[in-house]
Design a protein with these regions (language model features):
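Gram-negative outer-membrane beta-barrel transporters
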Residues: 70-76, 159-169, 190-278
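Extracellular loop and loop/strand-boundary signature of outer-membrane beta-barrel proteins
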Residues: 1-3, 46-54, 80-85, 127-135, ...
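Transmembrane beta-barrel strand/turn architecture of Gram-negative outer membrane proteins
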Residues: 2-6, 89-108, 143, 149, ...
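Hydrophobic, lipid-facing positions within transmembrane beta-strands of outer-membrane proteins
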Residues: 2, 59-65, 92-96, 131-133, ...
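Transmembrane beta-strands of outer-membrane beta-barrel pores
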Residues: 20-26, 61, 81-87, 104, ...
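Face-selective signature of the C-terminal outer-membrane beta-barrel domain
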Residues: 1-90, 162-165, 198-206, 213-221
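Membrane-embedded beta-barrel scaffold of Gram-negative outer-membrane proteins
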Residues: 100-110, 137-197, 202-206, 210
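Outer-membrane beta-barrel translocator domains and adjoining extracellular loop/strand segments
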Residues: 1, 26-35, 89-94, 122-128, ...
């Protein structure tokens, strides 16, 4: 990694980074196969063929440059460009955003947009069984905006709150799904073009008194991630929630710190998640605490 930052004035900061990485994966299969595990309710499923061990590598060279400009004290504009060379494939991505600090920096407004491109991971490509060397990269555009508020109620009490929303249009979204109806082997697949949008709420109250610090925080998220194109006339997955993406999630967290002692309590709720593209099967909601 090589990194360089230059600032001619307090209003403009430039940065550039050059990164190289070498990924290596070695894959082998289990040799002993228990055929009884491929029989369910008297139905015999195909036993997979054992493939020979192999290794694969890839070289990734990425260059990133960014600029942060503060034309006036309550506004910041940032932009970023990244070029990536990944095994003879060249990709450019970018992002741009703006931040407004208002009411003596108690109120903050943010917005950004970006073009995203994600290569499949080595596990997506070569995990055994199920890796798919032909899976395509994801790409698309994203937009997000947020408003946050931070207020000191008094010398002991601090309040934080934020509301944010986002929209993403992604082509070739990668999902791990059963291969050709075989429930035993799942493989990454490019499942259509997806539109994902949602809202997130966050709040936190912090109490300070001497060496005692206590905070109570919580967040709630609602998201809709649907396919936006039909693959055929009778496509039952069209405009359905994509698998494994719950519409609702929330959590609460309570922290107490005093000198070298601490206490943490947390509760997380995850809503129903569909496990098929036509929403015919789903997991029940659950909570953990």
């Amino acid at each position: 990694v090589a990194d360089y930052t230059y600032s001619s004035t307090d209003k403009l900061i430039l940065n550039t980074t050059l990164t190289y990485s070498h990924d290596l994966i070695r894959v082998s299969s289990y040799i002993d196969i228990d055929s009884s595990k491929y029989t369910l309710d008297g139905i015999d499923f195909d036993i997979p063929q054992v493939e020979s061990p192999f290794s694969h590598h890839r070289n990734i060279l990425s260059w990133q440059t960014s600029a942060l400009w503060t034309p006036i004290r309550w506004m910041m504009i940032n932009g970023q460009y990244m070029f990536e060379h990944n095994d003879n494939r060249n990709v450019s991505t970018w992002s741009a955003g703006i931040v407004f600090n208002l009411l003596k920096k108690e109120l903050k407004l943010k917005g950004s947009t970006a073009y995203n491109y994600r290569f499949p991971s080595m596990n997506d490509l070569y995990w055994r069984p199920g890796g798919n060397p032909d899976v395509k990269p994801e790409e698309g555009y994203s937009y997000d905006a947020s408003i946050s508020y931070r207020k000191s109620i008094n010398k002991h009490l601090l309040f934080d709150a934020e509301v944010s929303g986002y929209l993403m249009n992604i082509d070739n979204w990668i999902l791990w799904l059963p291969k050709d109806g075989n429930q035993w082997v799942w493989t990454p697949q490019n499942k259509r073009n997806v539109r994902s949008y949602g809202v997130e709420l966050y709040g936190k109250t912090t109490f300070h008194y001497g060496e005692l610090v206590s905070s109570l925080s919580g967040n709630y998220s609602w998201s809709q991630s649907r396919t936006r194109k039909k693959q055929h006339v009778d496509d039952n997955a069209y405009m359905r929630q994509i698998p494994y993406r719950p519409r609702f999630k929330w959590n609460l967290r309570w922290n107490i710190d005093y000198k070298d002692a601490f206490f943490v309590w947390q509760m997380t709720y995850t809503g129903r998640r569909f496990i098929t593209t036509d929403e015919s099967y789903a997991t029940d909601p659950y909570s953990v605490h």
